[in-house]
Amino acid sequence: MARDRRDYYYRQAKEEGYRSRASFKLKQINERHHIINRGDSVVDLGAAPGGWLQVAKELSGGKVLGVDLQRIVPIEGVETIQGNINADSTIQKIIKTVGAKGADVVLCDAAPNLSGNWSYDHARSIELATSALECAKKILKPKGNFVVKVFQGDMFNDYMQKVRDNFVRTMAYSPKASRSQSAEIYVIGKKFLTAPLRKGDKFVVDIEKLGSSGDGAVLIEGFVVFVKEVEVGEKVRIKITDVKPNFAFADVAERLGKTEKPE
């Protein structure tokens, strides 16, 4: 506590009426990466005591919802749910509150109770962040944004890849308000993908037409995929190389011959 009293952001939080010094982390993340826009609906997972909820409400002015296993002391203009984000009943309550279209932004600044065993604490942090990601995938709007805190360690890169698989842009960021000795870092996903495919997926397709750029253009579950270096009439096995909100790119993994024409 003595260290906290000497901490600049701790003092600033007290002076400005925020519930925790973590409020300044979200402010700095948003200043740099523009996660929350005016009018956005925001869901904060693991929100107690509510420092991020206060900032989210200031930034968006829209619907803000906090979810936590603990009761969150009320904040004006903010709704709360006491529940487990892994439970279907909690997901249903979130959707009922923010609406069927989903939230514009999902945040999670939660951390596990520290044991002092770093490998264990890192694994618990990744587990918690994975739960937050799975929840976000169920409640985010298409092109929505996601921010989650994790502890750095040997499982970090695998977790980053999971986020990359679901967002157009992904980055890691450490705000100035994080303590210098802290191993925490924030993973940011921008523009949530709702496509029926992901990078690395493979499909067998018939090339029936070319797009304006000369690439093959095929539909997979109604989603446009552009395939490089193909000709009309080819049957190919493709591998998805990049996914955007409205289309994807693919390379040829195997040429399977010509498309069979009906007699």
Swiss-Prot record:
Alphabetic keyword roster: Cytoplasm, Methyltransferase, rRNA processing, S-adenosyl-L-methionine, Transferase
EC numbers, comma separated: 2.1.1.166
Subcellular location(s) of the protein: Cytoplasm
Keyword check for Transmembrane helix: no
Active site: 149 (proton acceptor)
Major localization class: cytoplasm
One GO cellular component term: cytoplasm
Domain TRAM: start-end pairs: 196-254
GO molecular function, one term: rRNA (uridine-2'-O-)-methyltransferase activity
Residues that bind S-adenosyl-L-methionine: 50, 52, 68, 84, 109
Catalytic activity of the protein: uridine(2552) in 23S rRNA + S-adenosyl-L-methionine = 2'-O-methyluridine(2552) in 23S rRNA + S-adenosyl-L-homocysteine + H(+)
Pfam hit, one: TRAM
Biological role: Specifically methylates the uridine in position 2552 of 23S rRNA at the 2'-O position of the ribose in the fully assembled 50S ribosomal subunit.
Similarity comment: family membership: Belongs to the class I-like SAM-binding methyltransferase superfamily. RNA methyltransferase RlmE family.
Protein name as annotated: Ribosomal RNA large subunit methyltransferase E
Lineage: Archaea, Methanobacteriati, Methanobacteriota, Stenosarchaea group, Methanomicrobia
Originating gene: rlmE
